[in-house]
Amino acid sequence: MDQTVLDSAFNSPVDSGIAGTTTGSGSTTHFGVGTNFKVSVRSSSRSTDGTDSTDGANSDNVTGSTGSTPAHHSITNLNMALSQHSIDSATAASSTNPFPHFNQADLLNFHQNSLLPHHMFSQFGRYPQFEQKPDVGVLQQQMQMREAKPYKCTQCVKAFANSSYLSQHMRIHLGIKPFGPCNYCGKKFTQLSHLQQHIRTHTGEKPYKCKFTGCDKAFSQLSNLQSHSRCHQTDKPFKCNSCYKCFTDEQSLLDHIPKHKESKHLKIHICPFCGKSYTQQTYLQKHMTKHADRSKASNFGNDVVPADPFDPSLLSWNPMQGMGDNAHDSSSFNISSLTDQFAANTMIGSQSTNYNPAFQNSAFSQLFNIRNNRYLSEYPTSTKNGERAPGFNMITPLENIQRYNGSSSSATAVVTATGSAVVSSTPSSTSSSSAGSSSSQGGVFNPQSLINNMKNHSY
């Protein structure tokens, strides 16, 4: 320790680092330092009976410019002087190396200890500066400023938040199907999950089982299980019509509905042929190819079905187009010309084996389009069973049969071009008689009789 520091602290030379001297009479002098130094002398004598007595009156206090201070504070003042000297020495070295490097493991552990800030304050006179946590509000603002889905597909309108999702999506446009083929049918898929779901259709595996007691149902897809679990959630009566989620109160449901604003989960793309709905237009276009291939294979309705299944006009195409206002009225068919054409085609087929009988009669093609497309693009607003929910106003097969077959005494719904349903009751006797005399009088046409005649003839 620097000698000048001690001299300034005690204002007297110190020999051999001794902080006090002992007199011959037994009195001990203690030295201390403070703002104004003082020297206190305390005398103690020992009585003859062995007890200690302190002569407070004979105690002499030597003070500086200030008053007296108790003697037990002197050691504290000495420690403060030593600490001040350490701070001054460390401050001089802090300009070159404020935070030293540790070469030993125990020092490094102490460096990483929670007492590190206090130790550094005692050594360098200041607390270390650590990085502060970022402001949550500023961080959220930066996240909102960033585009949610910056990776956009160049072939369609879809966008993704991750580049890997975009690369998976591009396989659909490029026709890349790396997963497969299926061991049962040889199909390939763009994603592994699609292949796994497809294999379950062959094996019948249903790994997703309902966990509610008393319900043994199982499903091959997780989405089907989630939709099924809604029927067990009696404590959540508020159900979302766009997905499988349920809620306990109405406000939670109202807060959830805006998440479907992009129509991501809504099946708004409806097939005009069969009434099936899909969430994306590409799925609908892929489904429409089945109807186009079916029409080409049967050679029926080629004058009605568009040649290109991806034609945008296909989505707005009415399968009853070109049939007039009475498209669903069975009396609009000319039964005489239809039976004559059928007989002529049968004769041609019997004379030439290489001839493929394709009935090109317009009325006959329209008839088969009606049978193959039981669901209309313009659904009736009401039926005899009451109102249906939006999106499910489809004509059932039973209603379709009752429309053209008057054998039942129940009401038959006839749908006009405007989409309104007209219910008319037709007795069974009248319908049967009119069907029997249809060839001569052009009455009510029964398509079932024509189908039976076709089955009885061989081409």
Swiss-Prot record:
Gene3D superfamilies: Classic Zinc Finger (3.30.160.60). Interacts (via C-terminus) with transcription cofactor mab-10. Disruption phenotype: RNAi-mediated knockdown abolished expression of collagen col-38 at mid-to-late larval stage L4. Knockdown, whether untargeted, or hypodermis-specific, represses intestinal genes involved in fatty acid metabolism and beta-oxidation in the L4 larval stage. Drastically reduces expression of the vitellogenin genes. Knockdown causes transcription factor pqm-1 to accumulate in the intestinal nuclei at adulthood, but has no effect on daf-16 localization. GO terms for cellular component: nucleus. GO terms for biological process: cell fate specification; cell-cell fusion; collagen biosynthetic process; cuticle development; cuticle pattern formation; exit from mitosis; lipid metabolic process; male genitalia morphogenesis. It is found in: Nucleus. Residues 1-14, 57-73, 446-459 have a biased composition (Polar residues). Changing C182Y: In sy292; egg-laying defective. Fails to specify uterine pi-cell fate, has an abnormal uterine-vulval connection and vulval gene expression patterns are altered. SMART domains: ZnF_C2H2. Keywords: DNA-binding, Metal-binding, Nucleus, Repeat, Transcription, Transcription regulation, Zinc, Zinc-finger. It comes from Caenorhabditis elegans. Pfam families: zf-C2H2. Residues 16-56, 423-444 have a biased composition (Low complexity). This is Zinc finger transcription factor lin-29. Transcription factor which regulates the expression of various genes, including those involved in cuticle synthesis and maintenance, such as collagens, and in lipid metabolism. Binds to promoter regions of genes, at 5'-[(T/G)TTTTTT(A/T/C/G)]-3' consensus sequences. Heterochronic protein which controls the choice of stage specific cell fates, including at the juvenile to adult transition. Promotes differentiation, together with transcriptional cofactor mab-10, perhaps as part of a transcriptional complex. Residues 390-406 are annotated as: Interacts with mab-10. Expressed in lateral hypodermal seam cells (at protein level). Its main location: nucleus. InterPro entries: Znf_C2H2_sf (IPR036236), Znf_C2H2_type (IPR013087). GO terms for molecular function: DNA-binding transcription activator activity, RNA polymerase II-specific; RNA polymerase II cis-regulatory region sequence-specific DNA binding; RNA polymerase II transcription regulatory region sequence-specific DNA binding; sequence-specific DNA binding; zinc ion binding. PANTHER family: KRUEPPEL-LIKE TRANSCRIPTION FACTOR (PTHR23235), ZINC FINGER PROTEIN 384 (PTHR23235:SF142). Residues 1-73, 423-459 are annotated as: Disordered. A zinc finger (C2H2-type) spans 151-173, 180-202, 208-232, 238-260, 269-291. PROSITE patterns: ZINC_FINGER_C2H2_1, ZINC_FINGER_C2H2_2.
